[in-house]
């Protein structure tokens, strides 16, 4: 634990009453990690079908039929592509609820998209912090707050916020999708979570469009930054599971059928914990398949 003086010694540009210093904290390039995992998966005999949409899942006694549409290279037309799985694992993110519904799994949640918008500091501020800086988050919300991150390339990013999205894969401020909107307004949990967090939601929306409002969040702990220091940076989409009663799911959420297991909600630190989460899933699938074999015998 650091008091104000200890914080100032480690981070001269950060102000606060105190801080928790975690010496083991670090970052990685998740794109490179993912690419390497994909490479090793393919070496072991795996196959990754790109530009492929799952359209139907049909569970039978001894397998699951996976029906897909795949975009043809150098064209926009689609071709049918089907797979057969003895056991199916899905980590479907923004369409996790729709995938579980394909198998008629009774779930009480829906995925609501929240856009996380970032800025990058101008290069002269690459040394503004020595560590990763996180504010104290709101315990009522599963978001970490706008923080400063020193990236692998030496740059520093600011963010993210959490803005209600109107398209599940809408990375721009004005992206909308009628199907996604209809799904949301027909889901009672959407209205309840919106009512519970109305003030916060309005502030997040305002700050999304008004950069000084966004900057104010950072200035609480890094007062030397100015609006001109914030450069545009790609946004991300958080696939947030919301229950019918309007509760935001703060923890991991899984759903299953006899021959499938679905990761329905994976909050931070899901990427950091990806390998142990994978171990957990493998162990759970191993237990389920052993049960299937035992029942068959």
What is the meaning of each model-derived region?
Residues 1-50, 56-69, 174-193:
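Flavin (FAD/FMN) cofactor-binding and adjacent substrate-gating region
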Residues 12, 42-46, 59, 105, ...:
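Generic secondary-structure signature for well-ordered alpha-helical cores
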Residues 28, 32, 91-94, 143, ...:
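Conserved active-site and cofactor/substrate-binding residues in soluble primary-metabolism enzymes
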Residues 184-295:
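C-terminal catalytic lobe of FAD-dependent flavoproteins
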